[in-house]
UniProtKB/Swiss-Prot annotation:
InterPro entries to which the protein is assigned, alphabetical: ATP_synth_OSCP/delta_N_sf, ATPase_OSCP/d_CS, ATPase_OSCP/dsu
A Pfam family that the UniProt record links to this protein: OSCP
Top-level taxon of the source organism: Bacteria
Family: Belongs to the ATPase delta chain family.
Organism: Alkalihalophilus pseudofirmus (strain ATCC BAA-2126 / JCM 17055 / OF4)
Name the record gives this protein: ATP synthase subunit delta
Gene name for this UniProt entry: atpH
Subunit architecture: F-type ATPases have 2 components, F(1) - the catalytic core - and F(0) - the membrane proton channel. F(1) has five subunits: alpha(3), beta(3), gamma(1), delta(1), epsilon(1). F(0) has three main subunits: a(1), b(2) and c(10-14). The alpha and beta chains form an alternating ring which encloses part of the gamma chain. F(1) is attached to F(0) by a central stalk formed by the gamma and epsilon chains, while a peripheral stalk is formed by the delta and b chains.
Biological role stated in the UniProt entry: F(1)F(0) ATP synthase produces ATP from ADP in the presence of a proton or sodium gradient. F-type ATPases consist of two structural domains, F(1) containing the extramembraneous catalytic core and F(0) containing the membrane proton channel, linked together by a central stalk and a peripheral stalk. During catalysis, ATP synthesis in the catalytic domain of F(1) is coupled via a rotary mechanism of the central stalk subunits to proton translocation. This protein is part of the stalk that links CF(0) to CF(1). It either transmits conformational changes from CF(0) to CF(1) or is implicated in proton conduction.
Membrane disposition: Peripheral membrane protein
Major location category of this protein: membrane
GO molecular function term, any single one: proton-transporting ATP synthase activity, rotational mechanism
Amino acid sequence: MSNQAVANRYAYALFQLAEEKSILSQVVQEMELVKEVVNTTPEFLQLLSHPKVTTEKKRAFIENSFKDSLSETSLHTLLLLVENKRIESLVDMIDSFKEMSYEAQDMAEAVVYSAKPLTSEEQAQIAVIFAKKVNKAKLLVTNVVNKDLLGGLKIRIGDRIYDGSVKSQLDRLERQLIAGTR
């Protein structure tokens, strides 16, 4: 079975449990914390996937690392991944879980690329306008500054990209000019 299929199964089980206990939002935040730890500390997954480290030591490491910051549900999920030797699916599982929970809450994530930082008011306006475009009740906006855009915005929501950047407009114009001179 592929890592993604394994990740989806664990994500679905976690989603059902969190929804049943009415702690979906809390578990999403906890899983984001775990993902941040994994992304900023590569040794974390290296230790948990190392074949010479015993399962007991891995369990103790997870419990000591997260006992104060994770709910029993989230902690148990991590321990289950370790016990079943599926920890390599952790990041994919977190991503799948977030997708499922956002879908259930009629939400989506949007990454907004801009040449300069956006104010919270601008981000809120983008959230309202684009939530309607993608038929969602709420849009969670993350602003990423990319000076190469020169101006305008590039917005990624799921697999959709809305590109209104000056750079893309100049690139389009350049292609049209080159095509016209042939």
